[in-house]
Amino acid sequence: MVKRRVWLVILLVMLWEGTGIMAAPVAPADQKEILRTLTLAQYSIKQGDYNRAITYVDFEGMAKIVMAGYWDKMSLNQKNEIITSMKNLIREKFPIITRQLKLLKFGAITEKGNQVLCEALAVLDHTTENKDQKIQIGLFKRGNEWKAVEVYILKEGFLAGLNEDRVRPILKRGGTIQEALEAIRLVFEEK
């Protein structure tokens, strides 16, 4: 009985602190704003209004994830260059998303670390070979707005994977930011 209470207390502390194996809940007002942001982004993409759609994406946050471990060492010009490159790469992908994505069905929203994660089911056009996929969309709050910053597939961040698999090896061996950007472009062209 005492052991059971100890485990219950540990579990409650983990939930309260938002650490450990459980994710912390998100306030209902924030959940409403997050769903509004994601719904408007999805609508803008489907309507082909890509200029509006990119307002719901945190390109600086994306660039920081891709360049993790090197961001603080980069000059302002290099940072601006990668942010602009990320924006252009994502904008180029919107027409492909428009053709293949029928709908995003949003689910539970939880807080994990410095991001909020929204579970979603990406319902794809079944005339392609793609199958529906469960994903998580990571968001940051910038000022008063929530913005998408990362997509997790099987709990692995796409941009964090780019950093680990492509960017970090290039920069570790003494390569340039330009080489890292080119590697990122190649990955986006593959997708």
For the regions a protein language model found, what residue spans apply to each?
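Surface-exposed, charged secondary-structure patches
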Residues: 24, 84-134, 181-191
